[in-house]
């Protein structure tokens, strides 16, 4: 029998993702400023698409960096 680990998402099911919410978006970005995959963060397909669009929009508006220089 196979047991799957239940993933804990940082989002509630009905919570919307906004590009202005930088603290929330930073939870889904690695140290190298890459977007974390859906497998790792436990989001649904719809939430992952919204997240990717919001992160990309925030990068274009210079709210998030494209690459961390640390």
Swiss-Prot record:
Q: Name one GO molecular function term.
A: structural constituent of ribosome
Q: Could you give the subunit structure recorded for this chain?
A: Part of the 30S ribosomal subunit.
The UniProt family comment states: Belongs to the bacterial ribosomal protein bS18 family.
State which gene encodes it.
Answer: rps18
Q: Which residues cross the membrane?
A: none
- Does the keyword Transferase feature in the UniProt annotation? no
Q: Which cellular component terms (GO) are annotated to the entry?
A: chloroplast; ribonucleoprotein complex; ribosome
Cross-referenced InterPro entries, in alphabetical order?
Ribosomal_bS18, Ribosomal_bS18_sf
Subcellular localization, as worded in the UniProt entry: Plastid, Chloroplast
HAMAP family with a match to the protein in the record: Ribosomal_bS18 (MF_00270)
User: Does the UniProt entry include the keyword Chloroplast?
Assistant: yes
The top of its lineage is: Eukaryota, Rhodophyta, Florideophyceae, Rhodymeniophycidae, Gracilariales
Q: Which organism is it from?
A: Gracilaria tenuistipitata var. liui (Red alga)
> Which controlled-vocabulary keywords does the entry list?
Chloroplast, Plastid, Ribonucleoprotein, Ribosomal protein, RNA-binding, rRNA-binding
What is a single Pfam family found in this protein's UniProt entry? Ribosomal_S18
Question: What processes does the entry annotate via GO biological process terms?
Answer: translation
Q: Which domain of life is it from?
A: Eukaryota
- Where are the coiled-coil regions? none
Name of the protein in question: Small ribosomal subunit protein bS18c
């Amino acid at each position: 029998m196979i047991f799957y680990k239940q993933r804990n998402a940082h989002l509630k099911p009905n919570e919307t993702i906004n590009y202005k919410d930088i603290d929330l978006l930073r939870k889904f970005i690695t140290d190298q400023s890459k977007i974390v995959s859906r497998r790792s963060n436990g989001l649904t397909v719809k939430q992952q698409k919204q997240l990717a669009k919001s992160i990309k929009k925030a990068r274009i508006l210079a709210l998030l960096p494209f690459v961390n220089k640390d």
